[in-house]
């Protein structure tokens, strides 16, 4: 490595990506159900109670779609386009009995998460026996495999954290992807594999910790009434994500679902959304 290359590496290593706090504004919420009008209204009331934190300093317009207003995906998308909500709230398996088999989110939710740019809050199906009460957002987990620079995820997770609640920011590096990368590095004679492993792993985790530190400082400076906990780790994505959700007794999991390069749900988001069924999910 030349001296110029060394200088460039040192300069890049010293450069840190800061978090920029940008308060999430939600002008309207659309609650979508497949229930009759009266039951739909009751469900909407429960959702509004669960999301009471959103009423903080805002005058939000709440609308409800009941089961008699749509019977196809295009009809539902038309209703959403007409309403133009800032947030969609619904549950798994609309107009379907497949909620009894936990292998999908149902075609309506699948399409909503990809065909609209609006964040979707997915709640457990009303007929599914509840493993826990869904009453508030005192404990929110915002989780990804690459937290650095993901201001939107942090801002949305912070917006949904109740006053005096806890926000857990979790960065889980995929250990299998890392090992595949190191396997390739090990085949390059000019690179010390052991040194590369230590340096790369350390850099990945340090960058995430630095970014989260800037999140803590920015949210505190903004005066948000919440406590932030940082988790930076490696592991097998699905099992590690579930462990963090369970250990923290999360009320809400916030994660990214959209990928510019594909039509399907982003990365691990779909299997995780299918697996984590007992708590609401905010899918960005």
Regions found by a protein language model. Name each.
Residues 1-68, 138-198, 220-224, 284:
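Small/aliphatic-rich secondary-structure junction motif
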Residues 40-48, 106, 205-213:
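Short, surface-exposed alpha-helical segments at coil->helix boundaries
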Residues 65-75, 232-238:
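Charged docking surfaces used in two-component/phosphorelay signaling
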Residues 72-76, 153, 157, 241:
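Generic hydrophobic alpha-helical segments
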Residues 77-132, 242-284:
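Gly/Ser-rich helix-loop-strand patches that form or flank binding pockets
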Residues 116, 212-229:
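A structural motif corresponding to the C-terminal end of an alpha-helix
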Residues 192-210:
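A short acidic, glycine-rich active-site loop
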Residues 211-218, 234-246:
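A short, acidic, amphipathic alpha-helical segment used as a generic capping/interface helix at domain edges
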